[in-house]
Amino acid sequence: MEGVLYKWTNYLTGWQPRWFVLDNGILSYYDSQDDVCKGSKGSIKMAVCEIKVHPADNTRMELIIPGEQHFYMKAVNAAERQRWLVALGSSKACLTDTRTAKEKEISETSESLKTKMSELRLYCDLLMQQVHTIQEFVHRDERHPSPSVENMNEASSLLSATCNTFITTLEECVKIANAKFKPEMFQLPHPDPLVSPVSPSPVQMMKRSASHPGSCSSERSSCSIKEPASALHRLPQRRRRTYSDTDSCNDVPPEDPERPLHCSGNTLNGDLASATIPEESRLMAKTQSEEPLLPFS
């Protein structure tokens, strides 16, 4: 929409005619229609402004950007102002309703559910009243005349109809609630693929081994590596000890002649000789030494 509107400029010049153009939710104004090609003097986005009419003058209206700016405008007559108000309001409503289809569906479903809930409350009140009426008919005192069959039938039919309507409305509420809370309406976006785990740094491994002493594989491996080296280092010492022990045993004679003799290096026919002399052999040798030698005849 486009046309002439008077715009308030200042106290010196007062109201000045301007050419206004409303396009795609933006209201732009120019000095005249011929100056449209030169560029606008100003523009207003309808989505962020409020429309206000003058309470006394039926040709004036205001466009207010909260906390920033006021635009005072006046039409030629009341009918022209009404045309502009309808166009500006429609443009603002179309721009304001920028919700997605899913959000609109949720909002409409919520409104429908609220309406059905209010209907249920109304039918519940009607049911209570009708049940109370029937109870009065049944428990009427003897001094009152007995209720007619027609009145009882009418009350019963009303109660039955109200119950049916209540049940139908309740079923509709359940359907709306199921549609409102269906999973696809609130489906979350798929999560991003997981990032491959990063191997821990040596510093982290040392911290873990310090905090968990039972699982220090690195220390065990270091100990197993150090042990062969120390064993190799001790091997020559063991050999030296064995050599020195055997040498000292061979060099020093036994103090007791009755003590068993150790033969470390003597062999008989390639086999090791007995390490000790049997007791019978020693006795035989002793008796032979004690017997006198007989002269040869």
Swiss-Prot record:
GO terms for cellular component: Golgi apparatus; membrane. CDD domains: PH_FAPP1_FAPP2. Its main location: Golgi. Residues 198-297 are annotated as: Disordered. The modification Phosphoserine is found at residue 244. It is a peripheral membrane protein. Residues 97-297 are annotated as: Interaction with VAPA and VAPB. This is Pleckstrin homology domain-containing family A member 3. It comes from Mus musculus. The lineage of its organism: Eukaryota, Metazoa, Chordata, Craniata, Vertebrata.
